[in-house]
Amino acid sequence: MTKNSSTVFTHARIATLEEKAANLGLIEEAALVVKDARIVYAGPENKLPGEYASFEKIDCGNRLITPGLIDCHTHLVHAGNRAHEFELRLQGATYEEVARAGGGIVSSVRNLRAASEDDLVRETLPRLDALIAEGVTTVEVKSGYGLDRDSEIKSLKAARRLGEERDVAIRTTFLGAHALPPEMNGDKAAYIDRVINDMLPAIAEQGLADAVDGFCEGIAFLPDEIARVFDAAKAHDIPVKLHADQLSNLHGAALAASYGALSADHLEYTDADGAAAMASAGTVAVLLPGAYYFIRETQKPPVEAFRAAGTKMALATDNNPGTSPLTSLLLTMNMGATLFRMTVEECIAGVTREAARALGILDQTGTLEIGKDADLAIWDIERPAELVYRIGFNPLWKRVFKGQI
């Protein structure tokens, strides 16, 4: 298929994931038409307009078409790994103990600062390829392992280059307020000053960040410190996101909502008030079962409270070297169902429509609607539930990015 190709996918079943459609918006005996990288028709094949009769046809053999999957929370660009910390945790050390002993995020900072931009791209591509192989068409990538201006810029530039190396959409997030670098000697206020006055202006000037994130936790930054970063992001007209309530309830979810954040992520310790605040603000709850599983957390995010409040829920891998070295969004869906008791529809919507909402790109992708990008995943399955049910099996038949297979 060429960039300006016109293609009809015939003999398909289509899960449109439209907002108010029941049963994932499933259409049997359907066709989907792509023209100039956009969806121009998605509906019953017997109602296909005659104007598309001359288009190239691809017979889907009754396979299921969904929106291309979206991994809306990753730390994909990093250097090295932290397998040694994994061994420590198996021996009983907690995430906090590893971090306070100089491990955790700070060890990844040392590795990233020593790596070149080319090194980072080279090391990250295999992780990205693993996601792409499962039908992923959009990936969010955070910085946050540089923690100084040049290293954060290096990370974000490496992330943007991923989208040049592969047919995938990359959304970049500046996560300067991720951890306190060792050279700050515990002075968090001075470091936040650097984030606000040194890093963020340079990153904003170069247009390297689609969003600004922070880690609101006792071992990272407190709500008043995060608020300073968010105020600065607002001044630069950059939307915000937040790692919130992962290890304790500092009311990070409510803080994120108060800034109209695109999303608040993790949320194991979020309370009902936080869920309600997020629903009112339209802030998406991005749940990260890979991290929950990997650090053997026991506190589950309040899925029932999110449902009751009407908070939208997304799922993501949280790929990172310390707490979620996970590169499978299919497994993430299974974890969302088995660990968090999310429904099949919630899981599939969570890696398509709601993931797009969490990135502020629902107007472009995430559902199969006329005018949206032709980002598709075509699956060799009989029931949508198989995407969530199977473990260690990839039923992807074809992946389509901007209309191209």
From Swiss-Prot:
SUPFAM superfamilies: Composite domain of metallo-dependent hydrolases, Metallo-dependent hydrolases. CDD domains: Imidazolone-5PH. Pathway: Amino-acid degradation; L-histidine degradation into L-glutamate; N-formimidoyl-L-glutamate from L-histidine: step 3/3. Zn(2+) binds at H73, H75, H243, D318. GO terms for molecular function: imidazolonepropionase activity; iron ion binding; zinc ion binding. 4-imidazolone-5-propanoate binds at R82, Y145, H178, Q246, T323. It is found in: Cytoplasm. Binds 1 zinc or iron ion per subunit. Its main location: cytoplasm. This is Imidazolonepropionase.
